[in-house]
Amino acid sequence: MDIQLIIESFPKLLAAVPTTLTLAFISLLIGFVVSVPVALMRLSKNRIVSSLAYGYVYIIRSTPLLVQMFLIYYGSAQFRGVLSEVGLWSSFREPWFCAILALALNTAAYTSEIIRGGIQSVSLGQIEAARAVGMSTFLQFRRIVFPIAIRQALPAYGNEVMLIIKSTSLASTITIVEVTGLAKQIISATYSPVEVFIVAGAIYLFITFVVSRLVMLAEWWLNPHMRARVGGTAPKAAETH
């Protein structure tokens, strides 16, 4: 094993970390915004609305993210005329847009199920108490249901965040030079895949470790009973959910 190559590759791959994090952040932000209405649609008593949301979630969860990314990036060219007419072709021809769209749609489907589970975990007694004090349905959701649902869903959502960060590596297949894409370029020049991918793996490992600690801290902060259990100080370690 070439230790010198490992040392030299580390700063080079670190230069691609901002690209990886930017892809993940934008995708997660868009995905979360989309996931909330999708989750509410899944819980709707209207069968048409619920079925539409279910169909979207089922299709996304049943197909590989790589296939979804390829369909958006390569498949959009089949509709170039239509996309040009509505002014979207300039976006769809950009790898960044296609990667973010694929990642956002993917995480939105998974996150909607996480949020749906969180909403369903809210006890009926809390909802009835909100009704008793005269809260409207919207106010109940904003002040009671949604905050509790987020606390309940946070551990699972933390896993989704880490999954999307790792999934940004697929963007390298459509010419985006993030950590994995840059690793491939270095490998093509050095013919040493093991050393380079060890460094890339270590970088992903560190990023996901930091995210898991941040999620743990957020979970501790949002749950008063957890703070009381550890005497008001943040826990030094916690299991990854």
Swiss-Prot record:
This is Nopaline transport system permease protein NocM. The gene is nocM. CDD domains: TM_PBP2. Belongs to the binding-protein-dependent transport system permease family. HisMQ subfamily. One of its GO terms (biological process) is amino acid transport. Component of the nopaline active transport system probably consisting of four subunits: Q, M, P and T. This system is also capable of transporting octopine provided that catabolic functions are induced with nopaline. It is found in: Cell inner membrane. Residues 17-215 form the ABC transmembrane type-1 domain. GO terms for molecular function: transmembrane transporter activity. NCBIfam families: HEQRo_perm_3TM. Keywords: Cell inner membrane, Cell membrane, Membrane, Plasmid, Transmembrane, Transmembrane helix, Transport. It is a multi-pass membrane protein. GO terms for cellular component: ATP-binding cassette (ABC) transporter complex. It holds the Pfam family BPD_transp_1. InterPro entries: AA_ABC_transptr_permease_3TM, ArtM/GltK/GlnP/TcyL/YhdX-like, MetI-like, MetI-like_sf. The chain crosses the membrane at residues 21-41, 52-72, 95-115, 161-181, 191-211.
